[in-house]
Each structure stands twice: as structure tokens, then as C-alpha cells.
């Protein structure tokens, strides 16, 4: 669920997902349209696409199971749908970590009017 996603971002990227990515670019936060503005925004685009492929559970509300092994997040549990959600969240958190140096404050609270281009397909 979204609180677990926040926790994973804190653990993996070392920063608050809500603060840094809650309203960033064209895809971080609620909704998403247009073109990703930078690598961090692309992390959110890919995460949105990942959630869009999940069937049979609710990525924003359902709890999943994960553990930490040697500093890595390992998604677990018996429910394959919830495990998919975990993998989406884990991959996004890793993406945020790997692209921290591209984060640009000019995309924080980026106006939606700047996100009118046609979206690329997932």
C-alpha cells in the first residue's frame, strides 16, 4: 500500500517519498499524464505502468509482505498479486535512489498545464 511504498523509499533511497515525490514532474503523485520530465519523473511513470499491470488486488490499499536480507528488499508472501505490488514499489524505490542526482527542484509541484503532451505507452 502507499504507506509501505513510503517506507521502502525511505529505506532504499534515504528520503521521504511523500515530500520529494508526492508532487513532482508529470507522473509523481496522483494521476499522471504527458511526458516524464527527468529520470526521477520517469521512475514514477514506470511505477504507474507497473501498477497498471497488476490484476486482482489494489496497489494503493493492499498490504504486502517483504523482508530485508543483506540490505536488499525481498518481496514475499503467498499472494502473487501482492508480491507484484511489492516488486513495483521496490523497483521504484531503487530507481529513485539511482537517480537522486538528477532530481531538480524546478519539477517539485510542477504545474499540470506543463504536462499536456501525449503520453508515451507503457
Swiss-Prot record:
Catalytic residues in the record: 47, 89
Details of cofactor binding: Binds 1 Ca(2+) ion.
Main subcellular location of this protein, as a coarse class: secreted
UniProt KW keywords: Calcium, Disulfide bond, Hydrolase, Lipid degradation, Lipid metabolism, Metal-binding, Secreted
Gene Ontology CC annotations of this record: extracellular region
EC number: 3.1.1.4
GO BP: arachidonate secretion; lipid catabolic process; negative regulation of T cell proliferation; phospholipid metabolic process
Cofactor list: Ca(2+)
Annotated Ca(2+) binding sites: 27, 29, 31, 48
Domain of life: Eukaryota
InterPro entries to which the protein is assigned, alphabetical: PLipase_A2, PLipase_A2_Asp_AS, PLipase_A2_dom, PLipase_A2_dom_sf, PLipase_A2_His_AS
GO molecular function, one term: calcium ion binding
Tissues in which the protein is found: Expressed by the venom gland.
Localization annotation: Secreted
Disulfide linkage: 26-115, 28-44, 43-95, 49-122, 50-88, 57-81, 75-86
Family: Belongs to the phospholipase A2 family. Group II subfamily. D49 sub-subfamily.
Function: Snake venom phospholipase A2 (PLA2) that has high lipolytic activity. PLA2 catalyzes the calcium-dependent hydrolysis of the 2-acyl groups in 3-sn-phosphoglycerides.
Protein name per the record: Acidic phospholipase A2 3
Amino acid at each position: 500500500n502507499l504507506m509501505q511504498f513510503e517506507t521502502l523509499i525511505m529505506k532504499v533511497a534515504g528520503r521521504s517519498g511523500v515530500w520529494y515525490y508526492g508532487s513532482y514532474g508529470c507522473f509523481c503523485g496522483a494521476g499522471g499524464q504527458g511526458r516524464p520530465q527527468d529520470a526521477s519523473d520517469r521512475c514514477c511513470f514506470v511505477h504507474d505502468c507497473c501498477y497498471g499491470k497488476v490484476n486482482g488486488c489494489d496497489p494503493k490499499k493492499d498490504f504486502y509482505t517483504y523482508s530485508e536480507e543483506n540490505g536488499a528488499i525481498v518481496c514475499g508472501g503467498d499472494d502473487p498479486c501482492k508480491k507484484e505490488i511489492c516488486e513495483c514499489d521496490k523497483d521504484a524505490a531503487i530507481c529513485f535512489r539511482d537517480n537522486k542526482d538528477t532530481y531538480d527542484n524546478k519539477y517539485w509541484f510542477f504545474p499540470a498545464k506543463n504536462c499536456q503532451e501525449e503520453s508515451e505507452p507503457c
